[in-house]
């Protein structure tokens, strides 16, 4: 009981300190790179209400035409504010135009129609690829000076779009889905919202466009082609300030190739079981502020992307000049994430003063061979994490592929398959120059995993002034230039630190603490130039036979 009170107290302290920080600190203070100030939105004094154009509250009458008329009239006047007052407002897709501020008042709720005929198939980019999907509930393309503001709620009716696995639901929740209609799989483990969705799912090897179905047949699997809820493409001067965005069909917020973007004071929610239920996916954007938001979602919370494979490399637009401060993340596959679709690169990012509570992975970096792209100059500090069920910091350059295995007996000398050698090409991803400072994690599973590639090591990763209290310790694989300075790691299971085929590893500033004797394992013929803590010696140090005798300094 005392431990529970301590954890609750820690969370409360973190939340309170975060609020104070947000109220008193310049958002640009402490940035490690040169960044132009984000150009903010400004609107004409014109104000209209959706009611002025025949809008009807109550949640049963579609207001699609009323929204369109109101926006068209405001555009002709030079722009302004479209007010959605208190009430339930059912509608089909809303298309924002330049100089429009969609203002959803406190007590107002925009609910998007579950009628799939309201959402025609359109050309989009999803998961980093050019493709075809249903039109988004809210969209803007090549617009300038647009906003969604207010304290209301915007609901994408995502439950009508998504398949759900029985194992992710309670018995009561499962029965509710089955009773709503749709189709249950033959094995009784999955609920599909429609036959169209089921056909698309069965004709696809991914959650993107069904690759086993011709383009001419896409209409027959339309329900499977779920849209992101808010699609902002090629826009400039964009503000999202205040609303709750929830229950999206796929990703919640997707700014793409957009500049001068501000996301603040938002609540972004999705059921934890929602497939592709990301919070915000920032893709090939520049000059961005994301601060004072709360995320509780079904997939990655704050995710950085820049296109996938050849499509992303041809686009050649990195996500850059981004400040992310004072955000709270509850459930999500990752709190802050880069990848895996990062083929255009990512650079110049500052992430600080964020709290992750129960997030699957805290700080997550993922890619794989074939992506290409360079991720560099990422600065992360003042991050607090609690109850993280996997890694608090995790780099995985084998995402969607086979990761190296470091368990005892699975890399026995003389009894292992030779490593395949890959050439370095434009398809080789690069992660380098990433800095962590003042990271705190407690009551979590694993502290740090740094998994690079044999042909392209993780390079220049620095962690300092940080402390971790986890079950498992630290793993470094195929890395070059890793430095830990004033890092305390208290762990309870296995090896404190494992280093495999890595070089220029400086752990002199690592303090290990365990109920057992803290141990470090050095493995791999390519391992060299390793500096260890002075107090690790004798039986606390294990060096494999294949590792050079002079690998440890």
State what each model feature region is.
Residues 2-83, 88-101, 105-234, 241, ...:
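Extracellular "leader-to-stem" segments immediately downstream of a signal peptide or signal-anchor
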Residues 56-57, 309-313, 344-345, 371:
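Short, small-residue-enriched loops and turns at beta-alpha junctions
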Residues 79, 90-93, 113-114, 134, ...:
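Short glycine/acidic-rich loop motifs that flank beta-strands on beta-rich extracellular proteins
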Residues 88, 257, 267, 306-308, ...:
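Active-site-proximal loop/turn and secondary-structure-junction residues that shape catalytic pockets
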Residues 106-107, 144-152, 236-246, 259-271, ...:
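Right-handed parallel beta-helix
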Residues 217-219, 277-279, 311-314, 369, ...:
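Outer-membrane beta-barrel domain signature
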Residues 342, 362-382, 387-553:
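Extracellular beta-rich repeat passengers
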């Amino acid at each position: 009981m005392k431990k529970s009170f301590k954890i609750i107290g820690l969370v409360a302290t973190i939340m309170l300190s975060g609020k104070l920080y947000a109220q008193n600190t310049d958002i640009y203070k402490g940035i490690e790179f040169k960044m132009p100030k984000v150009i903010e939105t400004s609107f004409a004094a014109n104000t209209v209400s959706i009611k002025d154009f025949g809008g009807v509250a109550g949640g049963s009458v579609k207001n699609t035409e009323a929204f369109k008329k109101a926006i068209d009239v405001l555009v002709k006047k030079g722009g302004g504010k479209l007010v959605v007052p208190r009430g339930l407002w059912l509608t089909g897709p809303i298309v924002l135009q330049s100089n429009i501020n969609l203002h959803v008042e406190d007590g107002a709720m925009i609910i998007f129609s579950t009628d799939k005929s309201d959402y025609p198939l359109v050309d989009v980019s999803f998961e980093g690829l050019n493709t075809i999907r249903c039109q988004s509930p809210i969209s803007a393309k090549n617009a300038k000076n647009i906003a969604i503001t207010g304290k209301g709620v915007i609901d994408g009716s995502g439950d009508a779009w998504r398949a759900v696995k029985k194992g992710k639901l309670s018995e009561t929740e499962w029965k509710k889905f089955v009773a709503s209609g749709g189709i249950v799989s033959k094995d009784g483990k999955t609920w599909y919202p429609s036959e169209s969705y089921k056909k698309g799912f069965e004709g696809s090897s991914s959650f993107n466009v069904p690759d086993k179905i011709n383009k001419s047949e896409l209409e027959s699997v339309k329900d499977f082609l779920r849209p992101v809820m808010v699609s902002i493409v090629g826009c400039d001067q964009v503000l999202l300030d205040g609303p709750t965005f929830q229950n999206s069909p796929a990703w919640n917020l997707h700014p793409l190739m957009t500049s001068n973007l501000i996301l603040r004071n938002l609540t972004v929610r999705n059921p934890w079981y929602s497939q592709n239920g990301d919070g915000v996916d920032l893709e090939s954007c520049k000059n961005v502020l994301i601060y004072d938001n709360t995320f509780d979602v079904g997939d990655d919370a704050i995710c950085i992307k820049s296109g996938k494979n050849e499509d992303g490399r041809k686009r050649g637009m990195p996500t850059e000049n981004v400040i992310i401060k004072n955000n709270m993340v509850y459930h999500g596959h990752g709190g802050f994430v880069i990848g895996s679709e990062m083929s255009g690169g990512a650079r110049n990012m500052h992430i600080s003063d964020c709290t992750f509570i129960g997030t699957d992975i805290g700080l997550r970096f993922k890619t794989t061979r074939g992506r290409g792209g360079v991720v560099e100059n990422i600065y992360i500090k003042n991050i607090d994490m609690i109850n993280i069920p996997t890694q608090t910091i995790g780099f995985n350059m084998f995402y969607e592929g086979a990761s190296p295995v470091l368990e005892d007996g699975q890399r026995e000398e003389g009894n292992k398959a030779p490593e395949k050698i890959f050439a370095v090409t434009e398809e080789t991803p690069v992660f380098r120059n990433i800095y962590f400072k003042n990271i705190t994690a407690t009551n979590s599973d694993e502290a740090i995993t740094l998994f690079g590639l044999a042909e392209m090591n993780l390079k220049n990763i620095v962690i300092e002034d940080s402390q971790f209290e986890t079950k498992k310790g630290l793993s470094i694989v195929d890395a070059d230039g890793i430095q830990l300075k004033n890092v305390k790691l208290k762990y309870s299971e296995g090896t404190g630190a494992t280093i495999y085929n890595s070089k220029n590893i400086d752990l002199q500033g690592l303090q290990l603490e365990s109920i057992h004797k803290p141990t470090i394992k050095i493995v791999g013929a390519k391992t060299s130039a390793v500096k260890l803590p002075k107090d690790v010696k004798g039986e606390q140090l294990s060096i494999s036979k294949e590792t050079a005798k002079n690998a440890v300094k």
